[in-house]
Amino acid sequence: MVVYDVKIRNANSADLDAIMQVEKEAWPIEARASRSKFRERLMVFPPGVFVAVLNNEVVGVTTSQIIMYDPKNPPNSWTEATNDGNISGTHNQGGNAIYVVSLGVSPRGRPGKKGIGVGTALLERQKQLAKELEKECLVLSARVPGYNSFCENKGNVPIQDYVNYRREDGLPEDMELRFYERAGFKQVKICPNTMDDVESRNYGVMVEWKA
C-alpha cells in the first residue's frame, strides 16, 4: 500500500508561482483567479491562505476571508461575498464567520483513482482556523459542476431539483455538493449568477458548517 504524506501549511509570496500552476490545473479558464487576486488575499488575510504539499510540490490551495454572516440573509453570490475575489473590500476582521474564497486541487494531488484527501485536508484546516479564531461557522459558495452535463444528458431540470437529487447511498448526485456534505456542511441557499462557471451554469449553493 502506498502511503502519501500530505502537509498543509500557510502560504507565502514565494508560493505564488506554484499556486498559479495549481489554479491552472484545477479550474476551467473562466473560473481561474488571477495572480493579483492571490497576491491580494495573501496581503489582506494571510492566516486564511493554505497550501497542500506532496513530495515537495504544492498540489492544492485554499484561501479565505472573515465576513459578518447572517444565516437568514446569506450572501447572494460568490462575486458579492468576495468582491469578485478581491477581498480587500469584503474582509471584515470583526466578522463572525470564515468564508472560503477558493479551494483547488491539482491532478498531481490525486495520484490514486479516488484521490488521497488533499481537498479534505485543506477544508479541515479552514475548519480549524474557524475554531482558532472563535468564529461561529465556516461558509462558502459551492459550485455544482455536474449540473450542465446532467442537463445535457437528461434534459433541462430546475436547479432546485438537481441539488436535491441523491444517489443510492443517500449522498448528493453532484460531486462537489457530495464532497461538502461528507465534510459536515449543510445547504443553505441556491445562488444564481454566483460566478462565471459554464459547468455549473453560473449557479452556486451556499453551504455552512457550524464551528
Predicted region positions:
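Conserved acyl-donor/pantetheine-binding loop and adjacent beta-alpha core of acyl/acetyltransferases
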Residues: 62-114, 124, 144-173, 181, ...
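Active-site rim helix/loop that mediates acceptor-substrate recognition in acyltransferases
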Residues: 28-89
